[in-house]
Amino acid sequence: MLEQMGIAAKAASYKLALLSSGEKNRVLEKIADELEAQMESILSANVQDVEQARANGLSEAMLDRLTLTPARLKAIADDVRQVCNLADPVGQVIDGGLLDSGLRLERRRVPLGVVGVIYEARPNVTVDVASLCLKTGNAVILRGGKETHRTNSATVRVIQKALKACGLPEAAVQAIDNPDRSLVNEMLRMDKYIDMLIPRGGAGLHKLCREQSTIPVITGGIGVCHIFVDSSADIAPALKIIVNAKTQRPSTCNTVETLLVHQDIAERFLPALSKQMAESGVTLHGDETVMQVLHGPAKLVPLKPEELDNEFLSLDLNVVVVENMDGAITHIREHGTQHSDAILTCDMHNAARFVNEVDSAAVYVNASTRFTDGGQFGLGAEVAVSTQKLHARGPMGLEALTTYKWIGFGDGTIRA
């Protein structure tokens, strides 16, 4: 079954690569329109998935990721339209020039070909990835989690209807709707057909893909994100940033999980933090210093060492007091996932040092980690957030779904 999907996807990718920007945008507009027109069927499938997942004991954080609402689905359709407005990188000449030999050389952006994406309980990924792949002339094979198979199947049917209406092969966007996990292992060996693989899920999925895949893999999306409250931080705006980074949508990978507090500001800052977190319903996981300083009003539990390496994806926040900037940077290097980290400070020398020494895909000064998102970065919907350094890093927009080829123009030109 998967080999036939691969053959069809590869054939579709050749046709997609020839489309003009206008033709690709018309396809995306049709997809957005169909998502809104077929909203009832998608939401009905999603309700069944959510009910089944709840019965299976899925966590509230995962249920939130799984759930679609009319507003969320409308936002997904709007994201597709936003992709239409983005510049098409395909065909762009990156650089080039006339060589001494007389050969005129260009380095030009081209589609990757076929992209494979494995993801868990995130139905929005189906549309986000499909729209970005189509915009860049790539075919895509999707493998969502068993928790979302009804939603994904319904969504892909809508996308394929739009493709067919535009005269394009339905195989340009395909989903593996069989929840059998053995198919993941088979997909990981489809290097004959799939040019790049992107896993979006937990640490176990990423480990499996890194160890078993014969396809180049882009990993990321695991976000043990940190905020360091420097000794010079302005407490009021700092609290506002922390509330946003922790509570806006706790189940996302760009949510802060560990707060590092400079010891010189701890006694003034921690009580204010506790009050704010109590109002926001956040449980604090405090180290020894925090446990000594705080006595409410926020719920406070002792920090377990292993929690420093975990994504809570919930209204829980580690709080650690550090001696200085060195302590904060060392902690992030030991426990961070190179996703998103921030410093809250009024000292621009410290800000510059933090930016230069923290080796993460996104580093912020006096801003929330929640900005690490394709839409927020102006990239449109993202295919993933990469925490590695090759071939992409950070939110993966359109350019991350392209490669390049060298094109030489001559006039009977030969090498001397």
From Swiss-Prot:
One of its GO terms (cellular component) is cytoplasm. Its main location: cytoplasm. The keyword Amino-acid biosynthesis applies. It catalyses: L-glutamate 5-semialdehyde + phosphate + NADP(+) = L-glutamyl 5-phosphate + NADPH + H(+). One of its GO terms (molecular function) is glutamate-5-semialdehyde dehydrogenase activity. Its EC number is 1.2.1.41. Pathway: Amino-acid biosynthesis; L-proline biosynthesis; L-glutamate 5-semialdehyde from L-glutamate: step 2/2. Keywords: Amino-acid biosynthesis, Cytoplasm, NADP, Oxidoreductase, Proline biosynthesis. GO terms for biological process: L-proline biosynthetic process. InterPro entries: Ald_DH/histidinol_DH, Ald_DH_C, Ald_DH_N, Aldehyde_DH_dom, G-glutamylP_reductase_CS, Glu-5-SA_DH, GPR_dom. It is found in: Cytoplasm. The keyword Flavoprotein does not apply. Belongs to the gamma-glutamyl phosphate reductase family. NCBIfam families: PRK00197.1 (NF001221), proA (TIGR00407). Catalyzes the NADPH-dependent reduction of L-glutamate 5-phosphate into L-glutamate 5-semialdehyde and phosphate. The product spontaneously undergoes cyclization to form 1-pyrroline-5-carboxylate. This is Gamma-glutamyl phosphate reductase. The gene is proA.
